[in-house]
Amino acid sequence: MRGVAEAFAGAGYDVELPRLPGHGTAVSDMIPSRWSDWSFEVAAAYARLAARVDKVVVAGLSMGGSLTLWTALQQPSVSGIVCINPASQPQAEEMIEMVKGMLAEGTEVFPGIGSDIADPNVKESSYPETPLAPLVSMVEDGIKPMLSKYGSCKIPMLLITSKNDHVVDPATSDELAAQWGGPVERILLDRSFHVATQDYDKDFINESALAFAAKVTA
């Protein structure tokens, strides 16, 4: 999300770009982190930004999109949200039970799913492994409790979806758009994969997010 944050800062907006607990260091730091840790950090970043400005737009990619949805549900005064390939629907119960079984057997990680990028000249800086317990927490502590609340939120959303996403099923964006209680503006990306903010459409995403922010904060 650094590119999005820099685009907003370059356009004159105040910006907060929190580094979530367990992210950007080592897999060993991620293993004990949970939804409560990430949401706490996001809430703190929101509070810092809201103390400086009158209107706030929240944006996130993937799990950051989940936290963007969570922030909208927690803060009804948010002017708008930008969700890019968000994890908004829980994985199949069978998969979660399988992961729990692996955890019970002592398996803490499985091969990573990072760098889902179409542009061969770009590689995402991501962990080589995906910790399992944080994944379960994201689904059970984060996404599942939000499902019944999507319809009550009236905050405008810009929903950006990669048609060829190998991490988050693009069909879940259709579900989110149908569930959301506020106006939803949709953009479908033909050229980019999951990490669209670093892919072929990154500049288009930045331009679209800036235009949306200008509209909802006018």
Task: Please provide the spans of the model-predicted regions.
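Catalytic histidine neighborhood in serine/cysteine hydrolases
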Residues: 14-17, 174, 178-195
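Active-site nucleophile loop of the alpha/beta-hydrolase fold
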Residues: 82-92
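Short alpha-helix in the alpha/beta-hydrolase fold that links the catalytic acid
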Residues: 4, 155, 169-178
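Catalytic nucleophile-loop/oxyanion-hole region of alpha/beta-hydrolase
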Residues: 26-52, 57
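Short beta-strand/loop motif that positions the catalytic acidic residue
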Residues: 153, 159-161, 165
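Gly/Ala-rich beta-loop-alpha elbow adjacent to hydrolase catalytic centers
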Residues: 60-64, 68
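Catalytic active-site module of serine/aspartate enzymes centered on a nucleophile-bearing elbow/loop
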Residues: 191-218
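Short, surface-exposed "cap/lid" segments of acyl-processing enzymes
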Residues: 1-26
